[in-house]
Amino acid sequence: NERCYMNNLTIHKLTPGRLDDYLYFFENVAHTDNKKWDRCYCTNFCATNNSRILKKANMSDPDVRRAFAIDYINKDLLQGYLAYVDNNVVGWMNTNDRNDCLYCYGWKHLIADWRIRKRSKEKIKSVFCFTVAPNMRGQGIATAMLERAIKDAKSDGYEFMEAYPNKEDTDMYYNYGGPLGLYKKFDFEPFTETKWRFVLRKKL
């Protein structure tokens, strides 16, 4: 059962104090089997209007992406959870306040549908991305991170969790938003859809 996680797995919120672990993960662990995405640093989804900034910046340079990540984490604009096994970082989940992220680069260019790019009256926590170490996939780490995020969102007064899985099956890399099956485990329900993605919600 994928929800029976290993006893040595721990989940921690990303804070400036865990910045070094975050950088180490993206520089040495996250994409060792996918050099195309090496050192991505997951800067596309964050709580700032960075669409024009990132479009003009030389984001093909990993050092530029690294600098943005450091700045965003120190300002609490890039949020989520880090997963550890035996105190070694093995996973990342990007999740943030939906309304705060409507004008970030990822929302505009990756979700890319104006119909759902509207401020919500409800308090909603969005799930944007998962990355798990290649040798740790299939062991329930993404499931554990999502479970923790749901628990915290409810405690923080959020009314819904929202997610954006691909409509069509694709490889694990382009399933970075989490596969549909992951959300079905936690009873996410269809809310609407875009051309390429389902929009799911879970009432908290």
Region locations from a protein language model:
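Conserved beta-hairpin
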Residues: 22, 78-93
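Conserved acyl-donor/pantetheine-binding loop and adjacent beta-alpha core of acyl/acetyltransferases
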Residues: 71, 75, 88-129, 174-176
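Conserved GNAT acetyl-CoA-binding A-motif
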Residues: 123-127, 137, 153-172
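Active-site rim helix/loop that mediates acceptor-substrate recognition in acyltransferases
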Residues: 40-78
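Short, solvent-exposed beta-strand-terminating loops
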Residues: 25-40, 93-105, 152-153
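Conserved acetyl-CoA-binding loop-helix of GNAT-fold acetyltransferases
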Residues: 127-132, 138-154
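Conserved N-terminal entry element of GNAT/NAT acetyltransferase domains
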Residues: 2-55
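Conserved active-site alpha-helix within GNAT-family acetyltransferase domains
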Residues: 155-159, 168-193
